[in-house]
């Protein structure tokens, strides 16, 4: 079975070899763990963001940038993501399934290290995936860098030595944060299908694109814009082999949610910033195209809503 930690570590090695080119800042801590600053203080940009996204997906995806029009008005950068291992790349690796709260430090953990720590265990049981590697790679969405105690905790949970852990760190409101969160557009569709009860192992390949949101000064506002990129302008194409996918397609798009129609930050604020008051169905791409190769049929659902996306991004024409 492929090891997503092994594959991701090869990407990390490239990042370390060309740290200055990617404008990232590696730090070796007292316990010999490695923390790579990708946006807390470092001035990393698009290229580091693409690699960060690949690491989040266990090295099982290709990422690239392109230029598309938003609402037929302005050309804007989009991220494109493709994978031939959708369930593993998105659920076993990319899903932010590890809430890290240790020694006063909080971060959302993504990436292949989750597979070693089984965070959460149910995810790996459902897709029947396990990783066994002596090095752990984790991606942290946080506005601070972790200290030795945090890295010791991650190592312990993963069953490896602290010297065999590397963490990539980027805040939500940073260029890398914008890229890697927009790069979750495919994951949104795969996760939604998993929550609906679809066996995601039937998904053969996946492709998605979403605009890379502008960086906001306020982290809470940035959380809104980064989600809106996929919720209102994310497009995903899935190649599926059976599994009665036709019954699930209409339920995938974000427009099926009761919270759809307003910028995410507005909805979140109305809910008094309580995630439990939000409809989880909102975390989905705007539109999906699904080709079922077992029947030869292709289904579409949802639509792009550029108006809400641009409202969220806060574009001002001068």
UniProtKB/Swiss-Prot annotation:
InterPro entries for the chain: METHMP_CycHdrlase (IPR003209)
Disulfide cysteine pairs (residue numbers): none
Top-level taxonomic group: Archaea
Swiss-Prot/TrEMBL catalytic activity: 5,10-methenyl-5,6,7,8-tetrahydromethanopterin + H2O = N(5)-formyl-5,6,7,8-tetrahydromethanopterin + H(+)
Protein keywords: Cytoplasm, Hydrolase, Methanogenesis, One-carbon metabolism
Pathway(s): One-carbon metabolism; methanogenesis from CO(2); 5,10-methenyl-5,6,7,8-tetrahydromethanopterin from CO(2): step 3/3
Signal sequence interval, chain numbering: none
Entry similarity comment: Belongs to the MCH family.
Official protein name in the record: Methenyltetrahydromethanopterin cyclohydrolase
């Amino acid at each position: 079975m492929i090891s997503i930690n092994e594959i991701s570590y090869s990407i990390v090695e490239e990042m370390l070899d060309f740290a200055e080119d990617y404008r990232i800042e590696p730090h070796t801590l007292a316990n010999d763990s490695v923390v790579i600053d990708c946006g807390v203080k470092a001035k990393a940009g698009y290229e580091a963001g693409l690699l960060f996204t690949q690491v989040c997906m266990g090295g099982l995806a290709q990422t690239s940038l392109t230029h598309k029009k938003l609402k037929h008005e302005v050309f804007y950068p989009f991220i494109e993501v493709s994978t031939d291992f959708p369930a593993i790349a998105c659920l076993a690796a990319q899903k932010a399934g590890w809430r890290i709260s240790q020694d006063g430090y909080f971060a959302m953990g993504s990436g292949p290290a989750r597979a070693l720590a089984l965070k959460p265990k149910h995810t790996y049981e459902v897709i029947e995936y396990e990783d066994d590697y002596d090095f752990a790679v984790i991606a942290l969405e946080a506005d601070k860098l972790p200290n030795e105690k945090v890295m010791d905790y991650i190592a312990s949970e993963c069953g490896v030595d602290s010297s065999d852990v590397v963490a990539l760190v980027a805040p939500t409101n940073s260029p890398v944060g914008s890229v890697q969160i927009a790069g979750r557009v495919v994951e949104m569709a795969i996760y939604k299908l998993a929550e609906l009860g679809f066996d995601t192992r039937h998904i053969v390949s996946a492709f998605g694109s979403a605009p890379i949101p502008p960086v906001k000064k306020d982290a809470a506002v940035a959380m809104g814009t980064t989600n809106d990129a996929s919720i209102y302008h994310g497009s995903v194409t899935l190649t599926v082999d059976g599994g009665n996918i036709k019954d699930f397609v209409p339920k995938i798009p974000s427009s099926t949610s009761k919270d759809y129609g307003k910028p995410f930050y507005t909805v979140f604020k109305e809910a008094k910033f309580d995630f439990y008051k939000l409809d989880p169905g909102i975390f989905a791409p705007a539109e999906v195209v699904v080709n079922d190769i077992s029947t030869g049929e292709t289904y579409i659902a949802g639509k792009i809503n550029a108006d809400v996306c641009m409202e969220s991004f806060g574009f001002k024409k001068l």
